[in-house]
Amino acid sequence: MAERPARRAPPARALLLALAGALLAPRAARGMSLWDQRGTYEVARASLLSKDPGIPGQSIPAKDHPDVLTVQLQLESRDLILSLERNEGLIANGFTETHYLQDGTDVSLTRNHTDHCYYHGHVQGDAASVVSLSTCSGLRGLIMFENKTYSLEPMKNTTDSYKLVPAESMTNIQGLCGSQHNKSNLTMEDVSPGTSQMRARRHKRETLKMTKYVELVIVADNREFQRQGKDLEKVKQRLIEIANHVDKFYRPLNIRIVLVGVEVWNDIDKCSISQDPFTSLHEFLDWRKIKLLPRKSHDNAQLISGVYFQGTTIGMAPIMSMCTAEQSGGVVMDHSDSPLGAAVTLAHELGHNFGMNHDTLERGCSCRMAAEKGGCIMNPSTGFPFPMVFSSCSRKDLEASLEKGMGMCLFNLPEVKQAFGGRKCGNGYVEEGEECDCGEPEECTNRCCNATTCTLKPDAVCAHGQCCEDCQLKPPGTACRGSSNSCDLPEFCTGTAPHCPANVYLHDGHPCQGVDGYCYNGICQTHEQQCVTLWGPGAKPAPGICFERVNSAGDPYGNCGKDSKSAFAKCELRDAKCGKIQCQGGASRPVIGTNAVSIETNIPQQEGGRILCRGTHVYLGDDMPDPGLVLAGTKCAEGKICLNRRCQNISVFGVHKCAMQCHGRGVCNNRKNCHCEAHWAPPFCDKFGFGGSTDSGPIRQADNQGLTVGILVSILCLLAAGFVVYLKRKTLMRLLFTHKKTTMEKLRCVHPSRTPSGPHLGQAHHTPGKGLLMNRAPHFNTPKDRHSLKCQNMDISRPLDARAVPQLQSPQRVLLPLHQTPRAPSGPARPLPASPAVRQAQGIRKPSPPQKPLPADPLSRTSRLTSALVRTPGQQEPGHRPAPIRPAPKHQVPRPSHNAYIK
């Protein structure tokens, strides 16, 4: 990429001293130290105190930097005792320093860093005080105590004298905001979908309590290298000192800044850095994505530039872009001789990456530092004294961003084999050779760790981590981090480590869960969501013709961003939905601040009428890009999302290829590994297991293994038994049914039973018999089965003594109820009497035995009789036994007609 040489600012231009956001620069003579122009200051003599009170104070060491320092500052009015401890967590393992040779070859060095010289601490006697200093070249940094802020810097031509400049003496240099603006007091929590809010709140407290780690790379451009006297080591130390201050600012938010690399463009700029901050920002972000990310893994990158940006801007960063490949970064103008100035600006721009908006009066933010003492870091208008704390609004904005899914990369604990400056028990980091580290013995509250030796106490398995409870590891499958949105994946304890696995989320391009969109960097962006953000509840995207007509103009109100010449770019037809967002409905005016302008466009239709398109032009400050543009990752067509203001196919992410390896039983995560369903095992979800992935741990707890195995064994046994039954089915059928009586056969046989009463005689067995026989197997109705009945002839032709056996119901009444059967002229008039004595009176005359035995299945008999009604004359009807009611006559009881059996 061609280099754009930095333009030298005129000598009369002042250093801009305010934070990011539109800030006015006070004018000062170039070349004079700002510290010489700020009015009164105190001269302090510094000495290093020894633990032995009898040893006099020593000078601050220039090369040897102990782990712990106690420094005495002797002032004219009082003495201050500073307790300092080296910031061991500032530098991660694998930290690199990169510079370039004259031919452009990059040189990356990984040093042992025995010259660690960056400290955090407090003023003795004031627990609320804050100290952030470096001792690389004398004492330099900030001191906050008794609600006052001081800046400490070495004096020239001396080794033990320092300037202690109070904040009050710096109020004559004040930056003003070039535009009174604010994104709004409407946070993202207010406009996110209700279901997502409820799911996010369940994990809100857990997320906020967890420590977040920003793996940061700081780059100095060529102009910054020149401003620091072309001293490579001086530039590197300055960048690390800036990171040390920023880490101190963010600690109250439970965020740690971990420096993974510094880079100095000591030969030429690697991308175009000009006085246009917008162009410089996007050039740097493009270089980061294409060049820096492939060779150095990190979460965020910030450029410290020696170029004076035009206008009032001293920094710029995209809003809520942390962890994204395209926009996680910012540019900062080094506007002060002290590294503290650039550190505050970097903290401000990093806040925008976190989703923090400017603090304004209309938001009603609470700040514990008064404006005359610096105020808060996200103030849009500030200057000396530098702000060093965050407001309540910033905390709320951060919480809302985390709930929405921003910052998926922040929950990964950086690898620390040996902290910056060497291993030390008591620094709070578990380093190589340590089992635990809970800090110094006087501050350790961990009952599982021995603070003196950094070893576990007896019977303790672990001491730290979300998967450690009561000094023991939680069982595998225990949830340790829930999903925060529709594109996030939960994490579970593995049972082998005390820390929760690194955060993972759905692969870019994967459809959102329950939302019409695609996941991108762990967030589901949609046009509808952005319309609600701009216009409030009830807003929705406008028809496609609005995007096409408005964004083809290439002006401030309809465009696809800016081109390399900082001119508004027209949108191609295919990219129209990736330009300025077009909405309908919602509030009468944008809800995102007083500087938001409504742009309404009416498009006539051929059939009559007009389509109203509502866009916005929002000026949120020089340090924030236009929020009215469609966000990266938003769905612009089926199978496509917006990337770099272009509507591109999701296949560029490789999501389909990745999903194929999961066999339809899981989804692909951002590390291109399968996250399997609960009963399938990673890595490919093709075997039974406990779900999850190799990155996030098992979904189900392993203590269910015994139950699962038992169920599987039972199923296998049942299958084996069923197979044996199938093979021996004929033998079993003969054994079960050849010598057994069916239920209806038992009804026909004479067995003891309850004597039926008169009123129920005709229906006692009607309904049960019918239901039973309807389910009977058809083969029981064959003639062979009918002839095999053993008790039927005895029951009909030779009845037992009625006095010994209770009266049974007549089987034919089950099939042929009297109320449905027409009576024959000579048939019996009444049913059998209830008293057995009646049958004794007719014992002289016996009815003729039936010509055929009764069938085995009386219910099926009806259909058989129906088909057999056509008979030869004189053929006797089978199965109907006359029911005598009086002494039988001498003649045979007439047979009923054929119609008597028709139903």
Swiss-Prot record:
GO terms for molecular function: metal ion binding; metalloendopeptidase activity; SH3 domain binding. It is found in: Membrane. Zn(2+) binds at residues 177, 348, 352, 358. Disulfide bonds join 323-409, 365-393, 367-376, 480-500, 658-668, 662-674, 676-685. Gene3D superfamilies: Collagenase (Catalytic Domain), Disintegrin domain. It is an enzyme of class 3 (hydrolase). Residues 728-903 are cytoplasmic. The chain crosses the membrane at residues 707-727. Residues 654-686 form the EGF-like domain. The precursor is cleaved by a furin endopeptidase. Residues 1-31 form the signal peptide. A motif (SH3-binding) lies at residues 824-830, 830-837, 846-852, 852-858, 881-887. It comes from the Eukaryota. This is Disintegrin and metalloproteinase domain-containing protein 12.
